UniProtKB/Swiss-Prot annotation:
Protein name as it appears in the record: Phycobilisome 8.9 kDa linker polypeptide, phycocyanin-associated, rod
Stretches assigned to coiled coil: none
GO cellular component term of the entry, any: phycobilisome
Organism: Picosynechococcus sp. (strain ATCC 27264 / PCC 7002 / PR-6)
One GO BP: photosynthesis
Location of the protein in the cell: Cellular thylakoid membrane
Amino acid sequence: MLSQFANGTEAASRVFTYEVQGLRQTEETDNQEYAFRRSGSVFINVPYARMNQEMQRILRLGGKIVSIKPYTGATASDEE
């Protein structure tokens, strides 16, 4: 079991969904593959290995992470 985590096999397959509110529209966010409004929530799927980088990016853009859940394959509208 430890070897699975050590070589990253299991960790690499884990994905989490961030629910983010309050992102500002900037040149950097214009290049994203998803559209958002400042008042709405954005759902971003993030691989386990990039969680810290993505948190820093969201905070830098003025967003607030309101929830983090394991990705189940369901769309955001299915979960609500």
